[in-house]
Each structure stands twice: as C-alpha cells, then as structure tokens.
Amino acid sequence: MKILVIRLSSIGDVILTTPVLKQLKEKYPDAAVDFLVMKNFKDSIEGVPYIDNLIFFDKKENDGYQNMVAFGKKLAENKYDYVFDLHSKIRSKIISKQIKLSGAKVLVYPKRKWWKSLLVKMKLIKYHVDDTIVKNYFKPFKKLGLKYRGEQLLFTFSPKDLEKVKEYEGLFVRAPGASKETKKWTKKGFGNLAKKLYEKYNIKTVLIGGREDIERCDHINKISGGVCINLAGKLSLKESGALLSLAKLMVTNDSGPFHIGRGVGCRTYVIFGPTDPDMFEYDEKSRLIYKGEKCSPCSLHGNRECPKGHLNCMNKLSEDIILKEIEKDMENNN
C-alpha cells in the first residue's frame, strides 16, 4: 500500500501530524508513507522515522495553477492508494485532484464551517474550535482503522545540533515571537519574568526566535537587566529543538516553539490570548496560561491589531501569574 500525507505548512501544524503518522506506521508497517511539505518547513518533519519519503513543494518552482497541476501529475506517477490531505486549501486540493485522477482515494480532514468563520469576522460570535487539530487530523484516517490516542508529538534533531547548544543546558528558554502581533505577550512581561526567575533561582534565560525577533529580544533583555542570552536568529529550527530538549523549561506564545517543545519533552508554558486554547490538549509538561477575557478567543490565527483596540488578553496578563505556576512546578520536581 502506498500512502501520501499532505501538510504543506506551518511549523506547528506540520509537527502536529506526527501522532497520526506514528499510528499509521505502527498499524501498517509495510505501507510506503510519503509526506508532502513546503520546502521551507522541511525541518519541522525531517528525520521523523514514520515517513519513508519526504517530498518538498518549492514555491519558486511549483506555485501557480499550471505548475501545481504539473506537480500533481508527477506525483500521480507514484500510484498512491490513498492521499490524506491534512491541509485542505487551494494548493493541496489542486495537487490532490491530479492524483485522484490516477485512481487514488483522496480523504480530507474537516475544516471549520465557512459560515462560522464569517460570523467571527463580522464579530457576531466568538471564535471556538469544533475539536482539537490532532483529533481532526485523525478523522480521515478512520477509513484505515486509526483512532485518536493523544497528542504525543515528535520533533527530531541530530547529535551535531545538540553539540552546538550543549553549553546552554539547564537554562530557562523564552520564545517571545509569533506570526501575528496580537499573539505576542508583552516585552515587559517577558523581561520582568526573566528578571524575577533569575533573582529566585540564579538561572539565566535564553531567548529564541527568527531574525525578525532579534530587536524584540534585545528589548526584553534590557528590561530583564541583562540576565538573558539572545539567540534569536542564531539557531536553526533543529538546533532550537535540541536546545529545548536540554532546557529547564520554556515559556512561549501560541507559536511553533510550543509544538517543538512538546515534541522534545520540554516542560512548556504556553500563553494564549486572541486564539482558542481548545485547539490543543495539555498535560503535566504542557501548561496553559490563559486569562480568558470576555472577548477572547476572537480569531483562528490572531490579527495584526486587536479588534477592540485594547488587547487586554495579553496586556493584562501579569508575569506573576506565570511565575507562580513555574515556582509550583519547580518545587514539585526538585
């Protein structure tokens, strides 16, 4: 049996496919499982042992309707029995359609009803997910007898990645970036938290993120009184995962590092504001920090600006709330 799983982006959403892939390979060990992902997100899934062949979608070469049709026809030559489209957007639909013409069965994961999204945009209802992302990923796999068993994520890295970050073992980590401005907790909050943790535990905080987060992390370090180490823009995704595997704990916004941290077993505190925390499940190693304002959640992916202009879900969240959670866990685990 030949199977193609499609999830083109982004970091977290790709990592969230790993529980499905694991169970798929366990139930059908002889099946050939291919995975299609955008080239710029390959580090999110590369090295996962449940995949036989990783296929890259290169936007420079494959984007545009005609190119996507040609790309789909090329994939159809692999003679897949099943295609599981876990992206369910225009690119994956065009590609899947071409493979379907070759005789493959195409199954798509359920997206949110369009009219619910419209009502949220019109500010007539609050945003609420119908189910967790991982549970939704499992739904099209019922055809093959797969059943949801939890969010055991996996993120991999190499010994070389681990060696590069070995010197930061046992430190706290913060990931203050996010794809949208409204999903970012305050710089003051991150800075004050790092300062208070250093005063109590004499442990520094490593700041991680992309190049776009360098200035933000510099500002956070100044607020902390210089007790942070700014590695934003200096680590690859795999190196960030290796760092988190060695970290004492991480505090992050609702962004990719949350799922990387869970995928390497790092104790993680995730801050939610405008987005719905019910997209995921939590356990003793993944803690939810959520103020729960009356107007929250208000969007699926966050916005550039708060629809109400105050962003109270983030601005009113005190570092002391997170500090108390960390102190409690530090006491219980020492």
Which positions does each model-derived feature cover?
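Catalytic machinery of carbohydrate-active enzymes
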Residues: 1-334
